[in-house]
Curated annotation (Swiss-Prot):
Mn(2+) 2 binds at residues 13, 63, 450-451. PANTHER family: 2,3-BISPHOSPHOGLYCERATE-INDEPENDENT PHOSPHOGLYCERATE MUTASE. GO terms for cellular component: cytosol. Substrate binds at residues 124, 154-155, 192, 198, 268-271, 342. InterPro entries: Alkaline_phosphatase_core_sf, BPG-indep_PGM_N, Metalloenzyme, PGAM_B_sf, Pgm_bpd_ind. It catalyses: (2R)-2-phosphoglycerate = (2R)-3-phosphoglycerate. This is 2,3-bisphosphoglycerate-independent phosphoglycerate mutase. Catalyzes the interconversion of 2-phosphoglycerate and 3-phosphoglycerate. The gene is gpmI. It holds the Pfam family iPGM_N. One of its GO terms (molecular function) is phosphoglycerate mutase activity.
Length: 520
């Protein structure tokens, strides 16, 4: 029956609220549609960072965390928080999966290779987790411990890796003293642009694989700090540092050998999958691997994908009665729609980590533009995305639609202020079209964001481009009937609010509150 009035949840990715107007692309942008909606309809600010979304206090939110909380209707304690707590409680050092991997390699006098994003960013990993893993390996008798450092510069300032590399070297010096017979060091450095690709650009991943497995890089240095200094001389920021092998005291590059154990220390899945598959897929065809060492163990810190044949140190905790599941149980239809960059977020993450569609669910994927960086096309494919979304609203097929506009976040990450302004203006135009379509067809809209980004484009301390997310609140605007906004709220309150507006009870698993109380 095609006469449904859609409730549309629009997620403007990276669209935070910041009172300070300097280097604020959202403030600078000409956004008449959102300005008018804010003046005319019930609205409020909601929290998207720290404990409000299950992260450590003061930790900025991100798209994965944001969409999990949005769809779950409850605060979901994130892997970051679980792992940090396990370290402080002393459980981490006894984690059976990690201990088994270390013990197997150590008993055969083989090396433990620890790798991942060496960063305090807390989005894909945290350096303190890596340092704890180094400690675990040494305490269990590992005599060869190597760190392969992926450098950030995206969730951290563009040139900030020196502090992290220094900390790692200090940790090794502490664990492996001069009187120690063991060997522990940073074995390689490379930018995340290569090692953490998620768009099937296998040539990038190949560079990271050859560096780690074969010790083959574009460059070779005696220390990680020398490698970083040389990269900066080449005008490469952290994210783009070329493959650099760090030699052992004997002057040779370090390789992964048969019997070695590999431990991937990223906790976020999306940018860890491709690199993991290089080691775990029996039918791997991303690129031709020159050498495939017979490693003893490959451990994922968390489960990156159900079909990756490797154990995870921290298994996923299942979520029941998330938004999509609850709608399906009540015979409601739903649509998930976004560009490639945020498609996983409105599907997999919004569904609480479930890949499969629910009954009555449909999905539309609009390809993101094929450009090197999105400042080259700040509008991305928002016009086509909006065409599809407006068509879906007009079709009358869907009770609920969730759409993500990636522009504020993806262009915000480039650090280009002018491009971010254009991105925000493009999104504003699209929001106007969607709101009109919803109103013309008897529907309603909730407009919000998953975290901030574009509202701060310059680091106030360093003066560098600010490419990371922020801890700022985000707007929530309800375009519909008369309603009273709550004084405060979080992302986990959005699903309960949508259900209230749709005239549905929320399941008991959803502990979030209603933020837009209808006035009878």
């Amino acid at each position: 029956m095609a006469n449904k009035k859609s409730t549309v949840l629009m997620i403007l990715d990276g669209w935070g609220y910041r009172e300070e107007t300097s280097s604020n692309a959202i403030h600078q942008a000409n956004t008449p549609v959102l300005d008018n909606l804010k003046a005319k309809y019930p609205n409020m600010l909601i929290d998207t960072s720290g404990m409000a979304v299950g992260l450590p206090e003061g930790q900025m939110g991100n798209s994965e965390v944001g969409h999990v909380n949005l769809g779950a209707g409850r605060v979901v304690y994130q892997d970051f928080t679980r792992i940090t707590k396990a370290i402080s409680d002393g459980d981490f050092i006894e984690n059976p999966t990690l201990c088994h991997a270390v013990d197997t390699a150590t008993s055969n006098n083989k090396a433990v290779h620890i790798f991942g994003l060496l960063s305090p960013g807390g989005v894909h990993s945290h350096e303190e987790h890596i340092f704890a893993m180094m400690e675990l390996a040494k305490k269990r008798g590992a005599q060869k411990v190597y760190l392969h450092a992926f450098l950030d510069g995206r969730d951290t300032p563009p040139r900030s890796a020196q502090a992290s590399l220094e900390k790692a070297q200090q940790k090794f010096s502490k664990l492996f003293t001069e009187t120690d017979t063991g060997e522990g060091q940073i074995a390689s450095v490379i930018g995340r642009y290569y090692a953490m690709d998620r768009d099937q650009r296998w040539d990038r991943v190949e560079a990271a694989y050859n560096l780690m497995v074969n010790g083959e890089g574009l460059h070779q240095y005696n220390s990680a700090l020398d490698a970083l200094a040389a990269a900066y001389e080449r005008n490469e920021n952290d994210e783009f540092v070329g493959a650099s092998a760090i030699t052992s005291p004997s002057g040779k590059a370090i390789k992964v050998n048969d019997g070695d154990a590999l431990i991937f220390m990223n906790f976020r899945a999306d940018r860890a999958r491709q690199f993991s598959r290089c080691f775990t897929d029996t039918n791997f065809n991303g690129f031709e691997r020159k050498r495939i060492p017979a490693i003893s163990n490959f451990v994922m810190l968390t489960q990156y994908a159900a079909d990756i044949d490797a154990p995870s140190a921290f298994a996923p905790t299942p979520l029941t009665n998330v938004m999509g599941e609850w709608l399906a149980k009540h015979n409601k239809t739903q649509l998930r729609i976004s560009e490639t960059e945020k498609y996983a977020h409105v599907t997999f993450f919004f569904s609480g980590g479930k890949e499969d569609m629910f009954t009555g669910e449909e999905r539309i994927l609009v390809p993101s533009p094929d450009v090197a960086t999105y400042d080259l096309q700040p509008e991305m494919n928002s016009t086509l995305l909006t065409d599809k979304l407006v068509g879906a609203i007009e079709s009358g097929k869907y009770d609920f639609i969730v759409c993500n506009y990636p522009n504020g976040d993806m262009v915000g990450h480039t650090g280009s202020f002018d491009a971010a302004v254009k991105a925000c203006e493009a999104v504003d135009t699209c929001v106007g079209r969607v709101v009109k379509a919803a109103q013309d067809n008897g529907g309603e809209c909730l407009i919000t964001a998953d975290h901030g980004n574009a509202e701060q484009m310059q680091d106030p301390v360093s003066g560098q481009a600010h490419t990371a997310h922020t801890c700022e609140p985000v707007p929530l605007i309800y375009v519909g009937r008369n309603a009273s906004p709550a004084a405060s709220g979080t992302l986990s309150d959005i699903s309960p609010s949508v259900l209230h507006l749709m005239g549905m009870e929320q399941p008991q698993e959803m502990t979030g509150s209603v933020l837009m109380q209808l006035i009878k």
